Design a protein with these regions (language model features):
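Catalytic domains of carbohydrate-active enzymes that cleave complex glycans
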Residues: 1-148
């Protein structure tokens, strides 16, 4: 469903329907934020696990930072012209990487996306997502919400 709102926001943007684009973009972001929280409930779907694994491979702070940056690059900008070649649908990555990047695309600063990506990759990351207390109930609620 978020993909549908996103595609419509892109179409609205191309046709200069600013308010419609903003509305569809906000619906995209709202759904993605819910998905991010839901995925935080499972350790296999969290950026936190990937970053910790990379950082634990280093022995010095400089090594840890470099390993973290390399790990984040692999799942974001690695692949050159094949954008999002190794993309993952993980909690933390959705909230802290994909959503801000999408929002930046819809601003007049589209040419700054690569610069923003590099800054995100090379900056230390910390988890700020709180999982749902009851992920099953949250999933059912999300399904109901998207079927309206």
């Amino acid at each position: 469903k978020a993909e549908n709102f996103y595609k419509q926001a892109l179409k609205d943007d191309l046709e200069n329907r600013v308010l419609a684009a903003q509305r569809n973009l906000q619906q995209t972001v709202d759904l993605l934020m819910d998905v991010d929280r839901l995925l935080a409930s499972h350790p296999l779907y969290r950026l936190e696990e990937w970053v910790e694994l990379a950082r634990n491979s280093g022995t010095t702070l400089q090594e840890k930072d470099a390993y973290e940056a390399n790990a984040k690059r692999l799942i974001t900008s690695w692949g050159g012209i094949q954008e999002d070649y190794a993309a993952r649908f993980w909690s933390g990555l959705i909230k802290d990487y994909y959503i801000p990047r999408i929002q930046l695309y819809f601003t007049k600063d589209r040419n700054k996306i690569r610069e923003w990506e590099e800054q995100w990759i090379t900056s230390p990351w910390s988890n700020s997502t709180t999982p749902f207390d009851d992920p099953v109930e949250a999933a059912l609620s999300l399904i109901e919400k998207t079927n309206k």
